[in-house]
């Protein structure tokens, strides 16, 4: 039996539950109680909120460089290859971090990993703010990427394992919340850029990117301060490790469920535990998981490639379309993210319990393909009409991302595998997705330099591949009791 730190002693819980006793005789009983989710879930919602806080920080750190990359290029006199190195360093770190984080999430538990990874963000953010050259900056961004990579598998595990199975706020909706959280973080980074752009004297405008990158340490410190008070281990993972008493304790504290383990269950021989190992990565390509892994991987790769090329390059794209000021670029980028990507993400959370992740992803890719083909045809806008149409196409792309694959690729990654494989499943998915991000972030400056707006013809291949993949593999993770596969 795996030894588990009593994380519940750190979680506030209010009064002890006094309702009907729910007897927990095995891990399947714990999963069923979580899936039903019919009783008070105040602390469970707090855990989900803190997990989303980690995702918020991931998004902020990944997107914070978008407006500063031009200033960094000028300050350090970077070539296109050097710009790509700085821009992609964080995703290189995330590739390594996701593999390690996925394994550790299954090996030592969600709680321990979640409590530790914020250190990467604090140290790296401060190092970025004071980087004397591009090499220190790239190194600090790599360390920051390690934190992002480690954080996402464990955050997705919490979102999956602290939500009910069906109905409003189900597992798919909980996981989809990562999407509007992501866009909220991007929008806040834009607002911070706008604020500091307004208050910094022109003689110190080169401080802007340093302040924005360094600011990431503040939310990390806040999360460190509050997560130790409210976080607890996943009851599903604890039960899966054979620790029913720990799982029942978490259910009482986080869910207000009066769960107890009967004495006869405690007297039973220790159950066979699904031990985490590096070989579990191979299990993702065996049996029924091969088909799911293939779909989740394809969707994540193409979605990440297209989104990073467009969203990271959004300020560059807008300033290319409209030879305007930095202020105009910031305001248009902020409006597009809030009105379309963020709103699309909120709709995804609300509608996925009804329509499912598969159909909503299909609709999102269709929107993106239409938008990218429109941008490719328009090229560099001439006149107001073409300029407005180009911005409308960018808006359609971002709405399709928020409504479709942006929200639901994580559902395919998180809810295609049971508890015993969820960490490595998300870890592998993130590794491959970040590889796609690295490629797009590195290639985007080079492609734009050589192809200008014709680059949209290349990017349009991504949603096309997503559409074909969904039509070829019709797997719906929403509403399916995936954790039951550990007990069959």
Model-identified regions with their sequence ranges:
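Transmembrane-helix signature of 12-pass secondary carriers
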Residues: 2-488
């Amino acid at each position: 039996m795996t030894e588990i730190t009593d994380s519940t002693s750190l979680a506030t819980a209010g009064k002890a539950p006094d309702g009907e006793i729910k007897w927990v005789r095995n891990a399947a009983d714990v999963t069923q109680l979580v899936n039903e989710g019919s009783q008070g879930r105040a602390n469970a919602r707090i855990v989900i909120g803190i997990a989303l806080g980690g995702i918020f920080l991931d998004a902020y750190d990944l997107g914070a460089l978008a407006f500063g990359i031009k200033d960094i290029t000028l300050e350090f006199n970077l070539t296109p290859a050097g710009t790509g190195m700085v821009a992609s360093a964080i995703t290189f770190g995330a590739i390594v971090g996701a593999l390690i984080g996925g394994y550790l999430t299954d090996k030592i538990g969600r709680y321990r990993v979640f409590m530790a990874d914020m250190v990467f963000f604090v140290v790296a953010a401060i190092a970025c703010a004071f980087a004397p050259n591009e090499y220190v900056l790239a190194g600090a961004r790599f360390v920051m990427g390690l934190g992002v990579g480690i954080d996402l598998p464990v955050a997705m595990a919490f979102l999956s394992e602290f939500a009910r199975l069906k109905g409003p706020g189900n597992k798919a909706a909980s996981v989809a919340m990562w999407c509007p959280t992501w866009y909220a973080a991007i929008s806040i980074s834009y607002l911070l850029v706008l604020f500091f752009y307004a208050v910094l004297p022109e003689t110190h405008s080169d401080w802007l990117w340093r302040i924005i990158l360094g600011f990431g340490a503040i939310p990390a410190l806040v999360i460190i301060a509050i997560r130790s008070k409210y976080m607890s281990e996943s009851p599903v993972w604890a039960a899966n490790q054979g620790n029913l008493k720990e799982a029942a304790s978490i259910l009482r504290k986080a869910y207000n469920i009066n769960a107890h383990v009967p004495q006869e269950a405690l007297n039973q021989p220790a159950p066979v535990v699904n031990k985490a190992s590096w070989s579990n990565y191979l299990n993702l390509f065996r049996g029924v998981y091969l088909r799911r892994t293939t779909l989740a991987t394809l969707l994540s790769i193409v979605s990440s490639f297209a989104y990073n090329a467009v969203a990271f390059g959004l300020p560059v794209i807008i300033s290319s379309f409209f030879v305007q000021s930095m202020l105009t670029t910031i305001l248009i980028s902020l409006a597009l993210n809030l009105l379309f990507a963020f709103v699309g993400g909120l709709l995804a959370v609300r509608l996925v319990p009804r329509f499912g992740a598969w159909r909503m992803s299909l609709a999102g890719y269709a929107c993106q393909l239409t938008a990218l083909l429109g941008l490719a045809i328009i090229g560099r806008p001439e006149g107001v009409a073409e300029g407005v149409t180009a911005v409308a196409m960018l808006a359609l792309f971002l709405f399709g991302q928020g409504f479709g694959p942006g929200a639901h690729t994580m559902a395919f990654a998180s809810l295609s595998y049971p508890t015993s494989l969820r960490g490595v499943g998300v870890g592998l998915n993130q590794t491959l997705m970040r590889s796609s991000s690295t490629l797009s972030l590195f290639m985007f400056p080079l492609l734009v330099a050589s192809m200008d707006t014709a680059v949209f013809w290349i990017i349009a291949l991504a949603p096309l591949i997503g559409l074909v993949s969904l039509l070829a593999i019709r797997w719906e993770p929403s509403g399916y009791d995936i954790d039951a596969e550990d007990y069959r």
